[in-house]
Amino acid sequence: MLAINMPWLKNVEAAELIIGIDNPPSSGTVIVMLFNSSSTFVDLRDPVRVIPLPSGGTTPGRILDLASGEYAVVVYLDENGNGRLDKNFIGIPSEPLGFSNRYWPQGPPTYPRAAFKLEAGETKTIDVKLQPVFGKSGFFGLGVGVISTTSPYRGAKTWDVQPIPAISYIGDRVQILGLTARGSLLNLGDFALAATASYRFGAYCEKDSPYLQGMGSRDDTLLGGFALQARLPEGFNLSAGYEHDLLGRTSGGTGRLGVEKAFQQGLLTISPKIAFNWITDKLADYEYGVPAAQARPDRPAYHPGDAVNLEVGFTIFRELYKNWQLILSSSVVFLPSNLKNSPIVDQSHVFDSFFAVTRRF
């Protein structure tokens, strides 16, 4: 009751931020977003305060009546005047922006790197430099990685581990991440459409197991198709897509419907995911079936039909020194009964993991 009767005490306790821009733009609206949670900062959504800077950023802005605590500031140039931070197909901001603490992310923004303490009654000045995320031509990543997979095939080697180069290119409209590529076709804010391509390794070599001998090796191939990305409330991302064999080696394709959400734990960004993967009849037959001409007593003819499997996994990202970053991705695919029942299969699930240390240029 005492605090209610003495409102000036609130003014004494309230903190204030003054936000200035090192390089105010010649035109456009500059927007300040204030965050107090890593769960929303990681994908730059749902800030606790949003204000436009006066005079297009040439005059510092003020955020008043703040409680003491930990905050992070993001400032962006609203180039098209739509009142929101535009992002590309994979969720990277496509408008110039800047962060408190002179922080510049090397991947998903990390809250502790941009966060600062604000004490009761304190007035703190934050200066930010605006810069485009992609520069003039996007950025490249180069490093070393290791992939590890298990085989579901009867009598085959359980684990396969091999080193690979980790190469990537990230641009506003085009992204190449290892063996996958995307090109943006349509961006409507929370919904985006892209053309996609991916390299699919052959499922097996006949020398992998005596149960596969005489069936011939399965060829690598190139898939191509389309994908839809939808940003849902609370930071969930829904993706759906289909890719078909462009080289005609399997005459089939795969569809995918998945959900993913990013969390932060300290300096780690952790993104659990779950997906349903559809394998067309011809692709399932190519990778899991046994043609009648190749049947034998211990390997009867088998036609699995199309199949839907469940995939559960996660990706972990951590910024290291300067432009270096660490990426770990792992998933397990649970095979449906019509694939598990194949005479050349003796596993009910497949593990797949990828680890890399890369540098961004």
Regions found by a protein language model. Give the residues of each.
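A short tyrosine-centered beta-strand micro-motif
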Residues: 69-75
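Acidic, glycine-anchored loop motifs typical of Ca2+
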Residues: 78-87
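Outer-membrane beta-barrel "beta-signal"
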Residues: 121-127, 139-141, 164-170, 348-361
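Residues that define the transmembrane beta-barrel architecture of outer-membrane proteins
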Residues: 138, 159-165, 189, 218-224, ...
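Transmembrane beta-strand segments that form the barrel wall of outer-membrane beta-barrel proteins
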Residues: 142-152, 174-183, 207-213, 236-246, ...
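Transmembrane beta-barrel strands of outer-membrane/channel proteins
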Residues: 142-148, 180, 195-199, 240-244, ...
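Repeated loop/turn-to-beta-strand initiation elements of outer-membrane beta-barrel proteins
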Residues: 173-176, 191-193, 234-238, 266-270, ...
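Outer-membrane beta-barrel transmembrane domain signature
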Residues: 185, 246-338, 344, 359-361
